Amino acid sequence: MAGFKTKVTPEIENLTEVCKEHTSLDISLYAKYDVKRGLRDINGKGVLAGLTQVSNVKATKIVDGKEVPCAGSLSYRGYDIKDLTRGFIEDDRYGFEEVTYLLLFGSLPDKKQLTDFTQLLANQRSLPTNFVRDVIMKAPSKDIMNGLSRSVLTLYSYDTNPDDTSLPNVLRQCLNLISVFPLLSVYGYQAYNHYIKDKSLYIHNPKKELTTAENILRMLRPDKKYSHLEAKILDIALILHMEHGGGNNSTFTTHVVSSSGTDTYSAIAAALGSLKGPKHGGANIKVVRMFDDMKKEVKDWKDEDEVRTYLKRLLHKEAFDRKGLIYGMGHAIYSVSDPRAEVFKAYVETLAREKGRMKDYALYSMVERLAPEVIAEERRIYKGVSANVDFYSGFVYSMLDLPLELYTPMFAVARIVGWSAHRMEELINADKIIRPAYKNVLEPAVYVPLNER
């Protein structure tokens, strides 16, 4: 790329070593000054940094005056996620729009409120004239998340009142972004697929009478066709990813950036940058790729001993990416169980049966059962380990024929709702910029003139 240097030269390599030499910290100092690395204690529990009413993530209970692990639970505005998803399934209806209303406004809508709100979102589900051509199709990104961030920041220029942080204006902006995130994500992928992978280009308009999940599948597929089961399970997947407390990295980023008084587009773009990180939103891609490697290495998928041996090789950095991790296992908060994974699993088997993927499902189930045992045998752990939401979400997306490049953007399509609820909460309740402290651990230096160095 002319004019923009993209190669790491020997000079840059040398400067990197200089930077490392003078920047690396003695890790023993964290304990000395009682600094919680990653803002978490030794058990993974986060440092209390704020208050919220948006959602509650629970993984412990008090027994005989002591805090002990329990089955994980997740509630949105006080409503258990299992009850919410069960209600949508039993009524055979979609829930994304209803849960969006719940998270933003704090209560479940009645029929009229839901109809009006769904129509409001549908009416805003369009992009500025020529936005797809002039923004999304120009210089498409190799990573859809970066393209999504660029699109969000560019929408600032199309907003006639972008910097107004009054609550009605911020709510308007949030609802607009919630409505168009599916378009930005799918169209971003279509541009990538055409200009970078040299595939045919399909741009389908959304239909107002369809739900978010239905429109995603319609816009993504060349023939615009999908089954009712596919759309329902994608709807459930989106609901499970919509919100997860104020302390997860991208939502905390939303709080931090919102506290500065900046505009909505900048705050959401910052959250997207956080979510892109493989330690946050990209984990389900790792799970799928790990299983792809496992299927090549394990000859008999039904042989527990062979699967167990592969899992041990993962932990010993002898398989897959050699990072020593079994992806999809363990969570910063949950230890006994991740309620989102439990909800997912209830529908995964049904979809696997429809898609002819029962052999894959059996392997996933075996790994879910064996991995905690292997980790307990091979590692010193401070709490239990169980499958997290990423363990099954990648498998679900693969059965829905979603390309890997869209896995994290689908996370964003869901989590924009949670970010919006937390941005509103921050603006309504907080009046101070978030500004924690860092302890300096370097001794003072005496200045030396240039000609004496």
Give short role names for the model-derived ranges.
Residues 2-453:
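Non-transmembrane, aqueous-exposed alpha-helical and coiled segments at domain scale
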